[in-house]
């Protein structure tokens, strides 16, 4: 595991010493767990039945929440973390890792999930933020966190706060991959810009991003984010998943795209197949043929959303 962390270049930035024993909750373990998810698909689920479908389809993990993002968007009101009893039932029914979402800034929802024993916490803009100004200080926790980002500044701020994994925000619950594409391209484009900058300009960028200069330098050295970066937000088909992998994602989160479709069992398997074999168009074609477009979730045009309906703007 130490070799994996060294390969990621994290030794020069992370605050804890990584030459110690491997202990649960250590920085090394928290940053290694997401690395083992690379190339896989994490699926949103709301109950045991969906979790079992996800596991059977080959998902590397599930994300438990009270409502799928599409339903969160439609129902309105305050979206909170899932019922701990449901999360526990899912944990007891499957063998793959179980993640769960908390509201941005809600320290105690995160503490509850840590006590419950989830494998990872998503501090998510899909839920109603508890703190409009600040995210959770994730260094205090033994469990690893994933956070969303639309650009490099957001990504590096979340990593500085202790996030072990980043995902594009996209626009969750829409079945529209366009925002995930945009966010992935922005992050990768801003990394390329950093690489071409002088040291003085990089220091200015660090101040602009409100992050330590060391993490900017580490990003330049690696030529990528210092942690795993998955794609999320609007992924609904095998082709969507393959596209995001082609754009540089390390893996895929699928929210409403599977269980708001009319063919969740086969769609889950098809998305896993396309993600694992994104470099082979013939296999992606096979995956796409497994599903029927007529059974896909009803998508939402991003342009039809009012500014206050956008989830991605939460937590900058």
UniProtKB/Swiss-Prot annotation:
- Which Cys-Cys disulfides exist here? none
Pathway field of the UniProt record reads: Cofactor biosynthesis; pyridoxal 5'-phosphate biosynthesis
Q: Cite the binding residues for D-glyceraldehyde 3-phosphate.
A: 185
Q: Does the keyword Metal-binding apply?
A: no
Entry EC no(s): 4.3.3.6
What Pfam families does this protein's entry cite?
A: SOR_SNZ (PF01680)
User: Which InterPro entries does the annotation name?
Assistant: Aldolase_TIM (IPR013785), PdxS/SNZ (IPR001852), PdxS/SNZ_N (IPR033755), RibuloseP-bd_barrel (IPR011060)
Using the UniProt record, name the top-level EC class of this enzyme in a single word: lyase
Q: Which UniProt keywords apply?
A: Lyase, Pyridoxal phosphate, Schiff base
Q: Output the HAMAP family linked to this UniProt entry.
A: PdxS
| Stated name of the protein | Pyridoxal 5'-phosphate synthase subunit PdxS
Taxonomic source organism = Sulfurisphaera tokodaii (strain DSM 16993 / JCM 10545 / NBRC 100140 / 7)
